[in-house]
């Protein structure tokens, strides 16, 4: 995935399924300069990780 698509997903009112390493995640934010997104595991929203947007996959 790229930064542009992550930003589109963040601004969308629709639910768009995204995975990171096969795990469903919610995208919380995206840093356009570094290409890093903050994501939460859907099943464990208490923990967030910062990942490169290229590691995210839209399902």
From Swiss-Prot:
From the UniProt record, give one GO term of the biological process aspect: asexual sporulation
Query: Quick one: where is this thing mainly located?
Result: other
InterPro entries annotated for this entry?
Answer: SASP_SspH
List GO terms (cellular component aspect).
Answer: endospore-forming forespore
In the UniProt record, does the keyword Metal-binding occur? no
Decide whether keyword Acetylation is in the record: no
One matching Pfam family: SspH
Which stretches are transmembrane?
A: none
Q: Where in the cell is it found?
A: Spore core
- Which keywords, in A-to-Z order, does the entry hold? Sporulation
User: Induction: what does the entry report?
Assistant: Expressed only in the forespore compartment of sporulating cells.
Q: Which NCBIfam families match?
A: PRK01625.1, SASP_H
Instruction: Name the family.
Output: Belongs to the SspH family.
The protein here is known as Small, acid-soluble spore protein H
* GN (gene name): sspH
């Amino acid at each position: 995935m790229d930064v542009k698509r992550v930003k589109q997903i963040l601004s969308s009112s629709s639910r768009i399924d995204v995975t990171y390493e096969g795990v469903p995640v919610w995208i919380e934010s995206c840093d356009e300069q570094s290409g890093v997104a903050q994501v939460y595991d859907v099943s464990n929203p208490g923990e967030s990780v910062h990942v490169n947007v290229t590691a995210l996959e839209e399902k």
